[in-house]
């Protein structure tokens, strides 16, 4: 069928007619991968199924071109007539083609980046979607912004970006698939290399087909929900694959960039430029599956992994350092070690006999290797049986012990004139030790403030001094402070404990038992008052935590954000607390709940103001404040292009120290592959440096006044629909797959805080996820149109002020650009399909009204931004979205009709005979359908639905 063949390529070329630039290979990459995939589909399932998939694709592509909704109906009736086995294969095919399109994009982006670096052409760096290159940033600071080189070097040395990995319910892709995707990317990259021979090409092509087929034949659906340990292992796999080697490579690039602006020094290995933390196994907020045992396991697991990673590199280092010249200080140490160790260690692969004394560096490193071996084994024993026969003295217990012999080698090499050798693998190794430590990542603990209140309440009740929960804030503070200043223990083993109390105290006991370098911060969610922070300080002391964790209040809801500065000021006015914190405090601000509460515009503005106020308070008390940004991956939950988001923060709020959460669903796009990892580290570093040295402007008073007014109108409009419209919840539940979302086995956390209840009790994640699935994105734009309309009706000249804000004020610019990106991905026509099929007759008009509101908001946005068309400023993104859309449309239609069949068993469909050659024997049950044993729906429906959810999530990218 050659003419069909052309058709899918031709459709791809029609969708993105002009090349965006001469190095643009995206359409080529995409067509190659899709062609390979369709050939595989035909081999496995026969020509009829392949033809069916192509027809669906064509209908979708035609709809994308002419927006004729009749085509969607035609597509729907085609899809509903499929038998269960076929419908799973078709949904899975589209989901895979989308994944392949994403891989083609990643390769194209990395490729374009390399070409730009070669040419040194950064003309479009100023536009939103491109990211800042570290060398360009350094050069710009020195040449254009008049900073001295030393200032820049100093700022870099003292800057810290702490990336906090969180497990995430919508990391929709299984690890088994992530690895296959990595290999597909590599094949694609090599296939287009300049110096490739015909044989190479043939072998790569075979490898590519093999990997695509392996991915397609893997069950994409998790059949059991992941445990927190699974989530943690998934997160840690990125360290193995890319981050471990990526960090020293990146730091080396910074050395090069510094050299190129005339600094002839390397970045010291103990400069804390990048750090990694994690919430996986530490975040208990609303997740009953994270117990004290889980936390202990996760810490030991990370320590074991770290020791193993160092261990795997130490022999290479021993090979490299074969010199015999060394300093006296090192010679003495080597002789001591040589005399004391006499046995041969046969379980090592290299250097298993005793190292001769004329290789002093190897003697020293041999001892380090022994200690690493024992460190790893001890963690392994503790993890599997809780006890270990290896004494603690034989292992590394803190990072200083580990650094000391390595620093000794470094000093000695430099003293003997071998500095170039010292700056090789040894420097990389030192940097790894400094960045990752013995624990690989620092684990944060997060718990709700009410749980601490309950524990203290049971203590005060037990002591017979009243009920802590009923006391006023003043009384709580007085009691907590008198206890903190006193010395006596609060409770003994006779304290009556409920399951909840035992869980909270158990966590503190784990903090006391494990080495202090395992942990980062103790975060209190729903924190409102100083007593919330003091309570954690007291519990840490009572449970004998030797080096108490820093306590970080988290402010999320709109009202909490408004009250945050006052609460922090009250905290700083307590002398005991000021003595405890040593001039440093961290505050976390959460994006997702504030957005669900009041809509995106008001939440973003409230965040901005809260940060400004918090910084003022901290300055007044002489405290260095670190902001911890809890951003989601989606725009509705604070996501968006990294460097832009950083540069749009208020001036003075970052000051060279930034903590940001990297959500599960974004980890893959940020660290999934070497080049991506490099780019992510570069983006965060460059943007943080630039924000500190060249802060964005403060908004003019009239801009502030306008924003305040707009936020009030936007919140009112948002709440009038989401919270006050009596039938909104009913509409939301029927127009989106929210009810079915919980079946996806995506994360270890329940999707509701409380089983019954309306929008309030829904977690922010499913709320956003559901609207992204139908491509209506309601929480992101709702309220925005009303606000702009109100401002323009009040005074027609305000449009000029808004345009000025858009052009001059990064915060406003970013807020609008993200909105524009969401409009580019949205499609009310698709949302209408869901409405027609799933929403009750008398609610249809409500949906129509919302869609009208959507179109109006979009027009107003374009007017303010001065664009004729969505995304006209970003041709690259526009092209990528066009290529993805046709796949997503088919999945949307398939999802809407599948939901209809699940919810309305009487819905009439006319079944066809099976298309796939795998399922032609009708007497046999289809194996593919039997993978799902538990489904309560008709065969095949649940899996088809889950596949469409995953596919759409992959297509929208910043979804989850």
Swiss-Prot record:
It comes from the Eukaryota. Coiled coil: none annotated. InterPro entries: PEP_COase (IPR021135), PEP_COase_bac/pln-type (IPR022805), PEP_COase_Lys_AS (IPR018129), PEPCASE_His_AS (IPR033129), Pyrv/PenolPyrv_kinase-like_dom (IPR015813). Its EC number is 4.1.1.31. Pathway: Photosynthesis; C3 acid pathway. Its main location: cytoplasm. The keyword Phosphoprotein applies. By light-reversible phosphorylation. GO terms for cellular component: cytoplasm. Keywords: Allosteric enzyme, Carbon dioxide fixation, Cytoplasm, Lyase, Magnesium, Phosphoprotein, Photosynthesis. GO terms for biological process: carbon fixation; photosynthesis; tricarboxylic acid cycle. It catalyses: oxaloacetate + phosphate = phosphoenolpyruvate + hydrogencarbonate. Its cofactor is Mg(2+). The modification Phosphoserine is found at residue 7. GO terms for molecular function: phosphoenolpyruvate carboxylase activity. It is an enzyme of class 4 (lyase). It is found in: Cytoplasm. The active site is at 168, 596. It holds the Pfam family PEPcase. Through the carboxylation of phosphoenolpyruvate (PEP) it forms oxaloacetate, a four-carbon dicarboxylic acid source for the tricarboxylic acid cycle. Homotetramer. Belongs to the PEPCase type 1 family. This is Phosphoenolpyruvate carboxylase 1. The gene is PEPC.
């Amino acid at each position: 069928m050659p003419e069909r063949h052309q058709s899918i390529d031709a459709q791809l070329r029609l969708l993105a007619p002009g090349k965006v630039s001469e190095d643009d290979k995206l359409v080529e990459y995409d067509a190659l991968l899709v062609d390979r995939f369709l050939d595989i589909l035909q081999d496995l399932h026969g020509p009829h199924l392949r033809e069916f998939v192509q027809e669906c694709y064509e209908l979708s592509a035609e709809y994308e071109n002419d927006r004729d909704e009749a085509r969607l109906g035609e597509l729907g009736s085609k899809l509903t007539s499929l038998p269960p086995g076929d419908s799973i294969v078709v949904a899975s095919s589209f989901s895979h083609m989308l994944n392949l399109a994403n891989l083609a994009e990643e390769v194209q982006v990395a490729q374009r980046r390399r070409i730009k670096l070669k040419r040194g052409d950064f003309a479009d760096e100023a536009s939103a979607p491109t990211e800042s290159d570290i060398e360009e940033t350094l050069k710009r600071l020195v040449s254009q912004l008049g900073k001295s080189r030393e200032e820049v070097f100093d700022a870099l040395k003292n800057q810290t970006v702490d990336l906090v990995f969180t497990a995430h319910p919508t990391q929709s892709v299984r690890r088994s698939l992530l690895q296959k995707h990595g290999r597909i990317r590599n094949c694609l990259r090599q296939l287009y290399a300049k110096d490739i021979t015909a044989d190479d090409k043939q072998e790569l092509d075979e490898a590519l087909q093999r990997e695509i087929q392996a991915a397609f034949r893997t069950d994409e659906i998790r059949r059991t929900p992941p445990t927190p340990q699974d989530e943690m292992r998934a997160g840690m796999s990125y360290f193995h694959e890319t981050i471990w080697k990526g960090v020293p490579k990146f730091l080396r690039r910074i050395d090069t960039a510094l050299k190129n602006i005339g600094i002839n020094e390397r970045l010291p290995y103990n400069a804390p430029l990048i750090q990694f933390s994690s919430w996986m196994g530490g975040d208990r907020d609303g997740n009953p599956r994270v117990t004290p045992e889980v936390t202990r396991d996760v810490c030991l697991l990370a320590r074991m992994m770290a020791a193993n990673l160092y261990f795997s590199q130490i022999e290479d280092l021993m090979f490299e350092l074969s010199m015999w010249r060394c300093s006296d200080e090192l010679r003495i140490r080597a002789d001591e070690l040589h005399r004391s160790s006499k046995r041969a260690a046969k379980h090592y692969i290299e250097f298993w006999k005793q190292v001769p004394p004329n290789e002093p560096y190897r003697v020293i490193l041999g001892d380090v290797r022994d200690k690493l071996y024992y460190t790893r084994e001890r963690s392994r024993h503790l993890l599997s049986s809780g006890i270990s026969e290896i004494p603690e003295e034989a292992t590394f217990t803190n990072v200083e012990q580990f650094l000391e012999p390595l620093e000794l080698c470094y000093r000695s090499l430099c003293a003997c004139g071998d500095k170039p050798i010292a700056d090789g693998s040894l420097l990389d190794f030192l940097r790894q030790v400094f960045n990752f430590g013995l624990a690989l990542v620092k684990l944060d603990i997060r718990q709700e403030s009410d749980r601490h209140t309950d524990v203290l309440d049971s203590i005060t009740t037990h002591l017979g001094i009243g009920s802590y929960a009923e006391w006023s804030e003043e009384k709580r503070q007085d009691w907590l402070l008198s206890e903190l200043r006193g010395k006596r223990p609060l409770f003994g083993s006779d304290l009556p404990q409920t399951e909840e109390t035992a869980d909270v105290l158990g966590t503190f006991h784990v903090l006391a038992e494990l080495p202090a370098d395992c942990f980062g911060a103790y975060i209190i969610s729903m924190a409102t008052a100083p007593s919330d922070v003091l309570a954690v300080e007291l519990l840490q002391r009572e449970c004998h935590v030797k080096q108490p964790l820093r306590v970080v209040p988290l402010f999320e809801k709109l009202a909490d954000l408004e009250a945050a500065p006052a609460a922090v000021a009250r905290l700083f006015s307590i002398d005991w607390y000021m003595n405890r914190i040593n001039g440093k405090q961290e505050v976390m601000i959460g994006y997702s709940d504030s957005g669900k509460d009041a809509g995106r515009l008001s939440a973003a503005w409230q965040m901005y103001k809260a940060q400004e106020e918090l910084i003022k308070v901290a300055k007044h008390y002489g405290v260095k404040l670190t902001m911890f940004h809890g951003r989601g991956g989606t725009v509705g939950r604070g996501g968006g292009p990294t460097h832009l988001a950083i540069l749009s923060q208020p001036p003075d709020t970052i000051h060279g120290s930034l903590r940001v959460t990297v959500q599960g669903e974004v980890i893959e796009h940020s660290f999934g592959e070497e080049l991506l990892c490099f780019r992510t580290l570069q983006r965060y570093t460059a943007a943080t440096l630039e924000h500190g040295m060249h802060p964005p402007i403060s908004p003019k008073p009239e801009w502030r006044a306008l924003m305040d007014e707009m936020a009030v109108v936007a919140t009112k409009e948002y709440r009038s629909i989401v919270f006050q419209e009596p039938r909104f919840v009913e509409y939301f539940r029927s127009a989106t797959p929210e009810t079915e979302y919980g079946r996806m086995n995506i994360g270890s956390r329940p999707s509701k805080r409380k089983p019954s209840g309306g929008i309030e009790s829904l977690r922010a994640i499913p709320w956003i996820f559901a609207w992204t699935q139908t491509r209506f994105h309601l929480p992101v734009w709702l309220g925005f149109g009303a606000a702009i309309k109100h401002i323009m009706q009040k005074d027609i000249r305000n449009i000029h002020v808004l345009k000025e804000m858009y052009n001059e004020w990064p915060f406003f610019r970013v807020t609008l650009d993200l909105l524009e990106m969401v409009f580019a991905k949205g499609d009310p026509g698709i949302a209408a399909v869901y409405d027609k099929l799933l929403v009750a007759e008398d609610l249809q008009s409500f949906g129509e009204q919302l869609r009208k509101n959507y179109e109006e908001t979009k027009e107003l946005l374009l007017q303010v931004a001065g664009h004729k068309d969505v995304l006209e400023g970003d041709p690259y993104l526009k092209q990528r979205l066009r290529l993805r859309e046709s796949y997503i449309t088919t999945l949307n239609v398939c999802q809407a009709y599948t939901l209809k069949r699940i919810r309305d068993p009487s819905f009439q469909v006319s079944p066809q005979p099976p298309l796939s050659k795998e399922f032609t024997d009708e007497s046999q049950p289809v194996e593919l359908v039997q993978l799902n044993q538990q489904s309560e729906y008709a065969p095949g429906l649940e899996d088809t639905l889950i596949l469409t959810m995953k596919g759409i999530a992959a297509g929208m990218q910043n979804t989850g």
